[in-house]
Amino acid sequence: MSRSIKKPPFCAPHVLRLANRAIASNRNAIINIHSRSSVILHKFIGLTFGVHNGRTYVPVKVTDNIVGRKFGEFSPTRRFLGHAGDKKVSRKG
């Protein structure tokens, strides 16, 4: 089910507070956050967030294309190493 239209988009209060401070100070520093479930709001355009993936902070530059999506979508938590191939045994003559 999708979120009710009556409710506003979820954004953690500390993420809003950090973003408001960055907007007020006009700094281009990376804002490190752990809240992967927060929705990217229109006021975040131009800011860079470091989204935690469990090990490191992945930088996410907010543009108008990604407004309305969640921060966690841009910070993968698992590394894809490729599909397992056939392990063919080589025979010597």
UniProtKB/Swiss-Prot annotation:
Keywords, alphabetical: Ribonucleoprotein, Ribosomal protein, RNA-binding, rRNA-binding
GO cellular component entries: cytoplasm; small ribosomal subunit
Entry keyword Ribosomal protein: yes
Domain of life of the source: Bacteria
Keyword Metal-binding: no
A single MF term (Gene Ontology): structural constituent of ribosome
GO biological process, one term: translation
Family: Belongs to the universal ribosomal protein uS19 family.
Biological role stated in the UniProt entry: Protein S19 forms a complex with S13 that binds strongly to the 16S ribosomal RNA.
Full protein name: Small ribosomal subunit protein uS19
Gene giving rise to this polypeptide: rpsS
